[in-house]
Amino acid sequence: MGNYRKLWWTLIGVLGVTFCLLGWFGREVYREAPPIPAQVVSADGAVLFTEKDILDGQTAWQSVGGMQLGSIWGHGAYQAPDWSADWLHRELTTWLDLAAQDEFGQAYAEISEEQQAVLRHRLKNEYRQNQVRDGVLVLSARRQMAVQQTAAYYDTLFGSDPAMQQTRKNFAMKEDTLPDAGRREQMTRFFFWTSWVAATERPGQDATYTNNWPHEPLIDNQPTGENLMWSVISVILLVAGIGFLVWAWAFLRKQDEEEPVAPARDPLTTIPLTPSQRSLGKYLFLVVALFGFQVFLGGATAHYTVEGQDFYGFPLSRWFPYTLLRTWHLQSALFWIATGFLAAGLFLAPIINGGKDPKLQKVG
């Protein structure tokens, strides 16, 4: 063990530093988390919804699959859109259309480029400005109307409106994804908050709470210099780290004085199987069964990209919606991998123990 003392201390040092960094960044994540307004009110002071409504909306969104169906802030599945980015763009374009009708009597697409530029400037000023004061977020009358119209789209999308059936198929959403109208309303409030976070600048900074994500030219949501710098640094550190490991393996490790000779016979075949090793057959059968289950689920999940609700004409989403199959597909992989590692450990234990089963090994 003495020969490896330096390596042990190196490992302990690396783990100590990395866990300190992990703890510090974990604290920063909570400290820098975007605020949830205690109240969202209209320009005349009427309460539109509260923090509890936003959190209840998050629960409603999670109940239909959460990150398995679409995404929030880019962290989920992209069979359906990123709801925060989609909501933001729809709300912005709705605001522009409302403003164009109010001020010029035409749709935004029909007014001149100069008029469009004026409206986009006002749009950016209204959306990027942090308007939370003492936990209260105030919406202008125009923005309130844009939010209501955007929410109406999501209410029909997650319901059973026949006009949205093709869109639901494109997104691999079952009919009546969220049946309760009250829950759909709560969910739209959560979606609004996620888009508000993506559009609103942090106090004292010129970047939003999501560091200008998603890309949205209408309000100049573009990658910051900090984004680009750390992206480049991350790639450089990754390549440099891999290069250092290769160099260390080639030049720093101790070379064997003589090349080891491969045995004429596999050493494992010279050791008779113990009772516990023979009983591992059920584990291996379970691994194969779970692996096959995962493969078939993967095929069915992938097929949702072709037919958003059906499987060769069979209404699969009615019984096994996309979010459920995708969840089972991922979970079955975890189960067969974990079972395989467990079986390997149980098989190797008697070999390490000199060809004898550890006490009570077969019982386990």
Which functions belong to the PLM regions below?
Residues 1-7, 220-226, 269-280:
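Short, Lys/Arg-rich N-terminal segment immediately upstream of the first membrane anchor
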Residues 40-45, 310-324:
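Perimembrane loop-to-helix junctions flanking transmembrane segments
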Residues 31-228:
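Soluble extramembrane regions of membrane proteins in the secretory/endomembrane system
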Residues 51, 62-66, 265-275, 315-321:
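Short linear interaction motifs
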Residues 33-37, 299-315:
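Interfacial/capping segments of alpha-helical transmembrane domains
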Residues 255-280, 356-360:
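Membrane-interfacial, low-structure loops and terminal tails that flank and connect transmembrane helices
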Residues 8-27, 61, 69, 210, ...:
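Hydrophobic cores of alpha-helical transmembrane segments in multi-pass integral membrane proteins
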Residues 1-49:
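Post-cleavage N-terminal segment of exported redox proteins
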